[in-house]
């Protein structure tokens, strides 16, 4: 459970030292969130949803055996629905019968104001557990559009948006931008970032676009 993990890694001491108010999203008080999902029509969400001025998603980039990737969107979509209701892990109420649909339906209702995806210690292989850690010192993706941020993260793992069903659905829903050519990228060049990640992950530098930026469906300009 969350508090056990916090104690095991020493975060409870940090909270005490910094005088931070910790909220465990697995418990109430709740507000009911209506969802456009094939199985789960609504879910309780901690009242912090209506009290927070800004919602920040901070997580590490991982491959995931069902969700394809874990980045800023899945971090909130699967982290906020309470385990008290959906189970430990959250497989009691039908979420995993349509996982991508659940993630997209949650993110149509919960805005992420700032997405921070650390690639400093990423994971490839069989996530969410037993994967292979990848060290990319100082490599981080930050932005105010969670779809754009996760699109870049997906590219590091070798996926275009449609390979991550919930990401492509959210793009089509107008929640954010998934066309790399329309994303305002700052910092290092996207191809350089992909080379850094792939070299550390696989021992060989691989660039998804191979000279020219592919469009959202993988077609390169002539």
Regions found by a protein language model. Give the residues of each.
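N-terminal and secondary-structure boundary signal
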Residues: 1-222
